[in-house]
Structures are given as structure tokens and as C-alpha cells.
Amino acid sequence: MDMTRRIAGSELLVLILALVVAGLPVSAETLAGRVVGVHDGDTLTLLVEGNRQVKVRLAGIDAPELSQPYGQKAKQALSALAFGQEARIDSAGPDKYGRTLGTVYIGSINVNAALVSQGVAWVYRQYPHNAALDGLESGARNSGAGLWALPANQRVPPWEWRHGKELIEW
């Protein structure tokens, strides 16, 4: 009986530790450098030590494509926050295109969250994301911020826009 309690206690401890670790954000590395390019509303280039350029895709968000409504404004918003600034990237590793996927910080500002809060990007729910972004998106939507002020037929999530373009171009 005493041995059974010890085993059950050990299993419980392992389970608790696994749950705690599972809830922690995983960061492959942290990068620091100057933002030297903004490609669109969710992709930038960071100049890091050794004069190396790293293309960074902001994790957990998806901004309108440049060719869709609000795409240029999303790029301008990211540029206003980040271009020329010293940034820190908490990287989650590469995406399927080889870009560094990560959360961008300018000082204490979480740029990914700021873009969602301003209504210039959607939360990208295709992949695991920070649930706090959901609340920021709801706030932007409810207040009519950014792209949420567009007519409903112009508020097409980028992942649907890209899919539609693939069908048309095919």
C-alpha cells in the first residue's frame, strides 16, 4: 500500500511537471538586431551581429496580403513600430519557408500583440498561438479599429485570400 502511494505520488509529480513545461513558451533562440526591412504587415528583416540579415515572420498573427484591402496599411503599421529600431526576437524556429518565426519586441512592446490590438492583423489560428491575442483581436473588432472598420466583404482573412488566389491562378 505504501509503495503504491509512492508510485502514484511520483506519477502525479511527473504529470504536474509535464503540464507546467507544456504551458511554457518554447524559444529556439533569442535574436537581437536592427530592423532594416519591412516586407509586409507580418514579415521583416533583422540585421544581426556579423552583418547577417534574418527574415522574420511574426508568430501567431497574419496581416492582410499587400494586394488585399488594408495590406499596405498593415505594412505601414509594422514599419512605424519597427523600422530602424533595435529589436529582440524570441524565435520559435524556422517556418516552412525558412524564415525565422518569432515574437518581436521593440523595447517592452510586443509588436505582434500591438498589430493585433491596432486591428491591422488577425490572430493566426491555423497554428498554436498565444490565447491573449484572441482578447486583443476581440477588442479591436468591437471598437472597429483598423481593418475592422472595413465593410464586411473586404475583411477577408489572409489565409482565405491566399487560398482564393491559388484557385484563381490555377
Short names for language-model regions:
Residues 2-170:
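Small beta-barrel nucleic-acid-binding modules, primarily SNase/OB-fold domains
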